[in-house]
Amino acid sequence: MPAYPREGKIIQIHSYKHNGTIHRIWQETVVLKGTSAYVIGGNDKTLVMEADGRTWVTREPAICFFHAKHWFNIIAMIREDGVYYYCNLSSPFVWDDEALKYIDYDLDIKVFPDMTYMLLDEDEYERHRREMNYPDVIDRILKNNVQKLIGWIQERKGPFAPEFIDKWYGVFQAYQK
């Protein structure tokens, strides 16, 4: 069994908190590229279930990027006025045939079409760090990965490169036909 989902497979994405509780589930994402290092997925109008049972449906197509070594994942939301990115500071992903899974560590970076960005949820991170006793090593890793992610944004690296989204959104659209 490979440690990653195969291309074309429709998978769920499960986000957990550090204490092991479920945080959020995305019902359907099509795998556009799956390797042991990273998974690229696409979804549109997918059902999302929150930990408290509330559900909602995503509003626009999105290309998702998960890495097996970096402590973040990146969701590019394709809107009429441009591509918006939502970056979650998280554990690297794991794949177990049930779903692609990761631990959400509260800190987020929102990136706008002009590539300006905002670090979000620092208060929530500090509160959960205390409540769930995040180890100091995790705190250091996450803070280092915030800087790495900002570097990627500034350098237009990986998912932040315009050709990345153009390519993978095209692949996703081909699966939608």
From Swiss-Prot:
The residues listed in the UniProt record as binding Mg(2+) 2, with positions renumbered to this chain, are 106, 108, 121, 124
For this protein, the record's SUPFAM superfamilies field holds: FomD-like (SSF159234)
A single MF term (Gene Ontology): nucleoside diphosphate phosphatase activity
Work out whether the entry's keyword set contains Hydrolase.
Answer: yes
Keywords annotated in UniProt: Hydrolase, Magnesium, Metal-binding
Which Pfam family, an example, fits this chain?
Answer: DUF402
List, separated by semicolons, the cofactors it needs: Mg(2+)
Task: Name the PANTHER family on file.
Answer: PTHR39159, UPF0374 PROTEIN YGAC
Residues the record marks as active site:
24
Q: Which residues form the signal peptide?
A: none
- Protein name as catalogued: Nucleoside triphosphate/diphosphate phosphatase
Q: What class of enzyme is it?
A: hydrolase
| Family listed | Belongs to the Ntdp family.
